[in-house]
Amino acid sequence: MASFTTNSLALRASILANPRLPPPIIRPRLSLPRKLSFNLSLHNARTIVSSAVTSSSPVLSSKPPSQFPFSDSTRSITTLVLLAGVVIKSLIQKLSVAIVNLSPQIQASFRTASPLFFASLRDRPAGYLNTPLTVVAAGLSKWLDIYSGVLMVRVLLSWFPNIPWDRQPLSAIRDLCDPYLNLFRNIIPPVFDTLDVSPLLAFAVLGTLGSILNNSRG
């Protein structure tokens, strides 16, 4: 403490002795907050990292390939069905034109045979419908029987996980049966969370439709 006072007195004496000397310059110290530098450095680091990520990651503009619900086999089957329908329609038109242009002798033979035909129909049991709708009902019932068999094959093969469904004719069976089976998915909850019993409902609907068509036939 004594040395500090002596130094201050000596400094004052030197200033008074030589007034031309400039006074001592006391530089103020600037204290910046530490948090500001930390926030700035953190912000700069984030901007650098984000720019590096955006520059390094390429822009993916490739679109996923469109998935079609049906394969080529189903398309070929539908085209064949359409062609068969067109051919049948043309044949019916030609037959109708040919019947109109029949000779008088053939028309007379048809007129004589028609009463015999209707007389034979009288021996049918009661409730039998003699209309063109019975033919359509019979055809639909046959198609339902065939479709039920194909559906049974699809359900039985679904129990085997190693079946190659991408090959023919398995892909055609899958494309024909899956749209109908998907209508009954999640209607009945699976048993023990593993066994799907929704195909039973699908078979029940087919059986009901078949019985209705058979009853309409008489």
From Swiss-Prot:
GO terms for cellular component: chloroplast; chloroplast envelope; chloroplast thylakoid membrane; plasma membrane. Disruption phenotype: No visible phenotype under normal growth conditions. It is a multi-pass membrane protein. Residues 1-83 form a transit peptide. The chain crosses the membrane at residues 133-153, 187-207. It is found in: Plastid, Chloroplast thylakoid membrane. It holds the Pfam family YGGT. Keywords: Chloroplast, Membrane, Plastid, Thylakoid, Transit peptide, Transmembrane, Transmembrane helix. Its main location: plastid. Not required for the biogenesis and accumulation of native cytochrome b6 in the thylakoid membrane. Not functionally involved in the pathway for covalent binding of the c-type heme to cytochrome b6. Belongs to the YggT family. This is YlmG homolog protein 1-2, chloroplastic. It comes from Arabidopsis thaliana.
